[in-house]
Amino acid sequence: MAVARLALASFADGEVRLSDEVELYQRTYMTLLRSSGETQLRVLEPSHMAMGSSLHPLAASEELDLGAFIYAVRRLPDGIAGAELVVMGQDIEALSANGIPVEYWEEAEAAARRRRWYDSGTGTLAVLLASASDVDDLVPTLVAFQIEWNKIRGRQRAAGWPSETDAPDVPPEECARELGGSVDDWARLRDAWGESFGARMRLISERRLALRVRMLGGSHTGYDRLTRRWWAPVSAELAGEGLTERPLYFVSSNSHSLVNIVTGIAREREGELVTFIEQLDEHDILRHELTALREGDSPGSWENFLYFVARLYFTARGHEGWAERRAAEREKGVTHLRSKTALRVPAQVIPLDALDPRALDPRLGEVDAGALAASGAVIVNIDYPLGVAAYNILREIAVDRTGLRGVYVLGKAATLNADVGDVMISNVVHDEHAGSTYWLDNAFSVDDLAPDLRFGTGLDNQRAVTVKSTFLQNRSYLDFYYREAFTVVEMETGPYLNAVYEIADADRHPVGEAINFSKLPIDLGVIHYASDMPYTQARTLGAQGLSYYGMDSTYASSLAILRRILRLERVVGEVPGPELTRPSGTPTLPPDARPS
């Protein structure tokens, strides 16, 4: 089928320039990384500071920016503190061919970013990149980390602190008094570093950070190749279970919410989970929530409470708990597949006819057990990827499978007009990668989530912008989008929509055009939940994560997605129209459908 398009001048043509500083910074590191040699990271510091990133607003100031530092700390492995060189590549073979034997190095992890890191133990770190978005994400993170590390060191040396006679455990209050910054920020940094906090503070005082970076490879074909390797075990699982020719629903969300909703593992262990909570400290928030739920004083959901507690319960039991949970979920019809490539995106295969109707979350509605058993559909759910890896993944799936029936995207976003934990449903998405704007007939509205949204607020008819990196945006940049009513800032939807375009049309996805998605051969839904507020510095990704209460928006959204799939399969609720395409009316593209 043909997708309606309207050619428009792109931002790159000079009609609109969002930020010369951001563009200069990105161009600087991309050209430097083309070199086959090593690049001193410090050469990027001036352009990083000049950019005025909303995530690193104090980069050029002598004042510490602990929010940006904590953000970087959580997205880099511990070994970065002792590193001198960071080597980036697409696969182990490319690294080994260049004399970097990572297969013999120790694997490393970052707390808040799924990347495959390797630590030589002698000052060299290697990291595998899944897409070009990893470069846009990782390089500014490294620069921010180095800038703030050296600013902390400068203040330590000026204050002569800590001295050799000071206790090894450095209190956050003392850090704030001697170095500046808030006690809360130092406490969060201490939480991030754990028991090594005191030793790490001493290391900062002793060592000026001077990282070097080197890029090996980075071709489009290389990213396509690793995406194919990522998909291969999922495709093999579908073939091995006889699911190859079945209708497929693709969901990009997380690795826990859909599984909890369809398996009932947590609800089956209600007694054990309640006992587990009753044994926590009496001041623990979950103890208070349990009491409030029992007494009817909490608006929260009992099912969501059990899902949240189950994660803590199984985690507390270590590998035994993890193995028990995976086995139970497999028995309930969910197969987990872990990635061994640079694309660290776990996947789950969920055939609908393998599900037990009695185990489904009751909030889905009344289930027709016969229709569920007769459904030939299968859900492939993945943990949301980063940036343009989303395009690579969905395109690879669409090439390999002809029976794609629906695509649903659930992800985190920054909000310019709502609060953390709110849900945003957009019908316009501007993609900075391609410079195109998509006009959607979103499968979801607030009505689909409202019954299950207890703590947050639902906002539909929103406009989203897909950015290249959390760091590659500044205040003027955000102001520009806010004036154009683009209030949802995220990183994956644009690439997904580019892939959807190629599913629906004979051409490759366009660049710099407005695209009408009112008629598609598949069902399409996009939902975001607010995880940070860049207009409020204290409430950024570096400062606050989603808590127990923030989980409410995740489950309301996941329930809406699964309920939509089950309705399309005529398993629950009202049966939709006879075909999956959107209503025949084609809306006119408004003149302000994209930034102008």
Placement of each model-derived feature along the sequence:
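Accessory terminal and edge-of-domain segments that mediate assembly/interaction
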Residues: M1-S596
